C-alpha cells in the first residue's frame, strides 16, 4: 500500500521553501534592480561562461559525453537521458509559464512590474521575464547533475546561481524571476529523477563500477 504522506511531504516542504524564497526575492527586487546592474556582464569571459549554463546545447553536449563514457554501464543510457531531458523540460516549462504569468522584463529607467494583456501576442514569449528561461535550464541541469554526482553538487549549484546572477546584472530579469526559475528547475529535476533514476537518485555508474572492481583490475 502506497504511503501518500511520505510521498507528498517532500513536495510540501519544497512548496513552503519556494514560496518563502520567491516572496523574499520580490521584496528585494527594487534593491537588486538598482545595485546589481552591470550592462557589460556579457562582454566578460566569466559572464559568457556562466550564461552558457542556461543554453540547452551545453547540457546536450554534457549528456552526450556522459553517454559515450558510460554507455556500457547498466544505467548509463538512462542517466544520460536524464541529464539531457531535465534541462530540456525545464526550458519548455519556462516558456509555458511565461505565457501564464505574462510579466514583462525590467525597464531600463524605472523600476516596476508590468503585465502583458492576454489578448496581446497571446502565444509569444518575447519580452516576457517570469520565470527566467536561462536560469530554469541552468538549475534543472545543475540539480540533475548534482543527483548523478552528489559530491560535486556545490559546484553545480554555484555555476547555476552564477548564471542566474548574470541575468539580473544584465537587467534581463528581476531577482524574483530567477529565484522562481531556480525553485522550479530543482522541482523539474527531482520529479524526473523519481521516474527515470533508481530510487530517485543515482551515483555515477563510474563510481559504482569502480567500487566493485578488483584492486588488481
Identify the residue ranges that each predicted region occupies:
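Aromatic-anchored segments of alpha-helical transmembrane domains
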Residues: 20-27, 88-95, 160-171
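Interfacial segments of alpha-helical transmembrane regions
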Residues: 65-97
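Alpha-helical transmembrane segments in multi-pass membrane proteins
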Residues: 21, 82-90, 94, 181, ...
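N-terminal transmembrane-helix/juxtamembrane module of multi-pass inner/ER membrane proteins
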Residues: 1-63, 98-122
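Membrane-helix interface segments
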Residues: 43, 74-78, 107, 149-155
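Residue-level signature of transmembrane alpha-helical entry/exit and packing/kink sites
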Residues: 10-15, 75-83, 178
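Hydrophobic alpha-helical transmembrane segments
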Residues: 54-67, 134-138, 145
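Membrane-embedded catalytic cores of phosphoryl/pyrophosphoryl-handling enzymes
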Residues: 2-6, 11-13, 113-212, 216-217
